[in-house]
């Protein structure tokens, strides 16, 4: 990575802080407000410079489409087990305190890649691959997903578990149950945040 200017380092630190504190990156407007820029356009120019230097990667058309290569927030402590996330409050980060029901004494390294939290599954939309209502889905925090992977995705104020498929700016969130229709998302019009990948299931 090329050397950053002091201003670029400030922005990169702010992005990392947002990822650690909230679980997702800031918008251009939030960066502008934090750093004292007159407009989000100024933040955009700095982000483009950071991308050219390899410090970040940007997803076109997404207001929070910023990724720091190799940066994975919210790594779980092996001794503490994994937090169990229940119903996610609208607009709240997945790992916000109000979402955590309990802690499960299981080593995160049991999963590959290692799990960062357990999400309590609600509904039967993924039953055909053995993910049932009430199961605990082990999730590895990442903002990237490849076609065919089972993801935890945030669409608007809803968090859902589905199979991921993308073609250009179009994304389909596919159920594994014929009773549920695919969810189609145009990234030019809607924001979709990948919260993580499914790396296992625990049934109690």
Curated annotation (Swiss-Prot):
Residue ranges flagged as DNA-binding region: 28-48
Catalytic residues (positions): 125 (for autocatalytic cleavage activity), 162 (for autocatalytic cleavage activity)
Any one of the GO BP annotations: DNA replication
Superkingdom of the source species: Bacteria
EC number: 3.4.21.88
Site residues by UniProt (Cleavage): 90-91
A molecular-function term among this protein's GO annotations: serine-type endopeptidase activity
InterPro entries from the UniProt entry: LexA, LexA-like, LexA/Signal_pep-like_sf, LexA_DNA-bd_dom, LexA_repressor, Peptidase_S24_LexA, Peptidase_S24_S26A/B/C, WH-like_DNA-bd_sf
Catalytic activity annotation: Hydrolysis of Ala-|-Gly bond in repressor LexA
UniProt entry keywords in alphabetical sequence: Autocatalytic cleavage, DNA damage, DNA repair, DNA replication, DNA-binding, Hydrolase, Repressor, SOS response, Transcription, Transcription regulation
Pfam families (UniProt xref): LexA_DNA_bind, Peptidase_S24
Keyword DNA damage applies: yes
PANTHER family attached to this UniProt entry: LEXA REPRESSOR, LEXA REPRESSOR-RELATED
Family: Belongs to the peptidase S24 family.
Subunit structure, as described in the record: Homodimer.
Task performed by this protein: Represses a number of genes involved in the response to DNA damage (SOS response), including recA and lexA. In the presence of single-stranded DNA, RecA interacts with LexA causing an autocatalytic cleavage which disrupts the DNA-binding part of LexA, leading to derepression of the SOS regulon and eventually DNA repair.
Protein name: LexA repressor
Lineage: Bacteria, Pseudomonadati, Pseudomonadota, Gammaproteobacteria, Pseudomonadales
């Amino acid at each position: 990575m090329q050397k950053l200017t002091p201003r670029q380092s400030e922005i990169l630190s702010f992005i990392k802080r947002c990822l650690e504190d909230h679980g997702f990156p800031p918008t251009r407007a939030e960066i502008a407000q934090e750093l004292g820029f007159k407009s989000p356009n100024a933040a955009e120019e700095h982000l483009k410079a950071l991308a050219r230097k390899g410090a970040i990667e940007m997803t076109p058309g997404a207001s929070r489409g910023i990724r720091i290569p190799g940066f994975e927030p919210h790594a779980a402590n092996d001794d503490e087990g994994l937090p169990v996330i229940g119903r996610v409050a609208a607009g709240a980060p997945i790992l916000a305190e109000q979402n955590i029901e309990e802690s499960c004494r299981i080593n995160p390294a049991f999963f590959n890649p290692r799990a960062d939290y357990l999400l309590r599954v609600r509904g039967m939309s993924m039953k055909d691959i053995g993910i049932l209502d009430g199961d605990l889905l082990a999730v590895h925090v990442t903002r990237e997903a490849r076609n065919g992977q089972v993801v935890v995705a945030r669409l608007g104020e809803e968090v859902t578990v589905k199979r991921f498929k993308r073609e250009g700016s179009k994304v389909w969130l596919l159920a594994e149950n014929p009773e549920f229709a695919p969810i189609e998302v145009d990234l030019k019009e809607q924001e979709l945040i990948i919260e993580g990948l499914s790396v296992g299931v625990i049934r109690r």
